[in-house]
Amino acid sequence: SFQVTVSSLPKDIVRQSLKQLDSVITPDLKAAYKKHGLSVYEAITLASIVEKEVPKAEDRKIVAQIFLKRLAEGTPLGSDATYYYASAVYGGEPFPDLDSPYNTRMYAGLPPGPINTVSKTALEAVAYPSDTDYLFFVTGDDGVNHYTKTSAEHEQATRLYCKVSCATGYVPDSL
């Protein structure tokens, strides 16, 4: 982290932010990203999605692994956070069919850029994801993530654990 004052110029904030990021992304992390077929920029983009999807650090490695599997398979990431980001940036109501390159429910691959700031734990999660068979996750109304291996299990977990949030739509904490 770094300090910003009211008199800080935008270029100085960006410079400080990049310097901080450069100190976190070590050669080992860069090598790990490369093993996953990701550039540093792509890893930052994926980490930003992981960061926004799951605020709890202990869940990030599992979610990173799920998203990395989807990228490798060429299937959409399916992140609600990305279409909420698109609606906040480009205007309009957030919905899964929002036509934007940031909508990873609609388009496979990574969006054009990060959707959020990233933490060291999110960057490390992308570099060193969990090793599980999970392909899906849903965050329940209680904030607990439920991981599943099949689409049918995911639909059941959504019905059981996400009655309110999933009925009203994803509500981001901040964009």
Predicted feature residues:
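Bacterial extracytoplasmic/cell-wall-associated proteins, especially those involved in peptidoglycan
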Residues: 1-175
